[in-house]
Amino acid sequence: HAMVYSRLSRRLRETGHASFHDYLGWLQNHDGPEWQEFVNALTTNLTSFFREHHHFEILAKYLKTRSVTGGWRIWCNAASTGEEPYSIAMTVMESLQARTASQLVASDIDSKVLASAEKGVYRLESLKNVGEERLQRFFLRGTGANEGMVRVKPELRQAVQFVNVN
């Protein structure tokens, strides 16, 4: 309850509404970008690269031992800022080694986190679960003002299609 109150209180201040009742009434009578801001305010975005590492081991084994006609189609729901879909894409690319086509769609209801995911820029420290071999294969390290940052390489970025669903 406190989390919802806190998050929506910010929306009230930014939109100039005096109460939750006024704000929700206004939302019900207006289509437009504030609906997406409302959704974004209520989402929680907890993610990391190779979170629940054993899941990726199971996925790799599954991909290597199964054949599929027409290629793999994978959906990553609640993609957040992209760490999990990129982890899935790395696992797929390593496991299939271009033997089978794949399509990975990553969706979320929060447009702001998806914009971040599409950029594919992360703090190097957030890749603690990504080994050095993967880091070199799939990421570009920042230099100068961007030192301590990484960007996904085009090969990895192109393996994921990000979609806002809501």
Language-model segments: which ranges?
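Short, well-ordered amphipathic alpha-helices
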Residues: 58-63, 85-95, 118
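Active-site micro-motifs of SAM-dependent methyltransferase domains
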Residues: 10, 94, 111
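Conserved AdoMet
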Residues: 1-75
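Helix N-cap/coil-helix junction residues
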Residues: 17, 97-98
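Conserved class I S-adenosyl-L-methionine
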Residues: 69-87, 101-105
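Extended basic-aromatic, gly/pro-enriched interface segments that bind polyanionic ligands
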Residues: 98-166
